[in-house]
């Protein structure tokens, strides 16, 4: 049972790191976009990655593999990141 728990922790943490770091990478790429369309595309991908990260954080919470206080703040922050990125995409699309 312990080995299974450790394996689940590894899988969840790997997914959170992958999708979480992808947010920043896509925002960075967007800042060097060659066109408005490219900028919107990269920011939209960052928004999708933020939603995926939010999913993995909720899954981590529901699995009870970490303390409640640890994931509550991360989930709240991920919601804020989603709101920010969504607003950037929508505003950029209106201006395009």
Regions found by a protein language model. Give the residues of each.
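Short, C-terminally biased terminal segments at protein or domain edges
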Residues: 1-29, 33-96
């Amino acid at each position: 049972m312990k080995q299974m728990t450790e394996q689940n922790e590894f899988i969840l943490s790997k997914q959170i790191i992958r999708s979480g770091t992808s947010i920043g990478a896509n925002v960075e790429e967007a800042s060097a976009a060659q066109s408005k369309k490219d900028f919107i595309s990269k920011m939209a991908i960052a928004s999708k990655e933020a939603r995926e990260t939010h999913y993995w954080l909720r899954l981590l919470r529901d699995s009870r593999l970490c303390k409640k206080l640890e994931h509550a703040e991360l989930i709240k922050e991920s919601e804020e990141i989603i709101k920010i990125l969504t607003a950037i995409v929508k505003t950029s699309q209106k201006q395009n």
